[in-house]
Amino acid sequence: PRIAISHSNIVNMIGQLGAVFTKHQINIDKMVNNSKGELAYNIIVCDILPQDVTELVADLYAIASVKKVRVLNQEG
């Protein structure tokens, strides 16, 4: 499964995203980050995601600079 996240291109953004995945005990298998000016985009590939990703997505949106979260290839 993958999660796509668009956000402001600011210091410690990757650290904040990683902290959310750590909180939910989700291993990040691969992370791709790209930015242009003030905007950035991450695609995070995970080994597994919980069947209900509502709390994970809410915690990602709780990061002030996150603009959009999209769960891709969620099974179940």
Enumerate the language-model features and the residues they cover.
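A conserved regulatory-domain signal marking ACT and ACT-like small-molecule sensing domains
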Residues: 1-76
